[in-house]
Amino acid sequence: MLVQYHDPDLHDVTCSGSLIKENAVLTAAHCCEVIQNLTKIYNDNYTDYSVLAGTPDLKSFIHKVSPEIPIKAIYIHENYRPPIENENDLAAINDICIIKLEHSFNITNDIQVVQLQMNKNRENLEIETHCHVSGWGLDEV
């Protein structure tokens, strides 16, 4: 799953994410913040962005072999705080965002909704809880 900026000469991958409903993607707030800032500057809507799914290979995304769905809305966590570089604080706080899509992906063998693990009481996870993540970003800080 990736979010892409449309430019005829440039296939710019903005960020990766996970399909949490047929029409919703869970991703990082720092990715969504960039999209929101650029849309405010240029056209005040998300028509230049779309979400693609269906292959783990970035080259396949670039060659348009996967479905492409426009973005309808972006919801950044209300307590998101980006890293503060000049204070050497490289960790973002509440770096989470949900992207709502214009319509749903068709669920196939290659496109699936992730199964989010919740504890019984829907409480916050304990510090140092073992988790699995996916994406094409940094693998260490």
PLM region spans:
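Conserved H-D interstitial segment of serine endopeptidase catalytic domains
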Residues: V3-H6, V25-A28, C32-E85
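A conserved glycine-rich beta-strand in the N-terminal activation segment of trypsin-fold
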Residues: H6-E22, A91
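Short helix-loop capping/hinge motifs at secondary-structure junctions, enriched
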Residues: D9, L58, F105-T108
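Sequence contexts marking disulfide-bonded cysteines in secreted/extracellular proteins
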Residues: S16, H30-E33, I98
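Extracellular/periplasmic catalytic domains that process cell-envelope and extracellular macromolecules
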Residues: L19, Y42-N45, E68, D89-I93, ...
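Hydrophobic, repeat-rich solenoid/adaptor surfaces of innate immune receptors and signaling proteins
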Residues: L19-I20, L26, K100
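Active-site substrate-binding loop(s) of clan PA
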Residues: I35-T39, N79-N88, S104-V141
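Conserved beta strand-loop-helix elements of the APE1-like EEP
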Residues: C97-S104
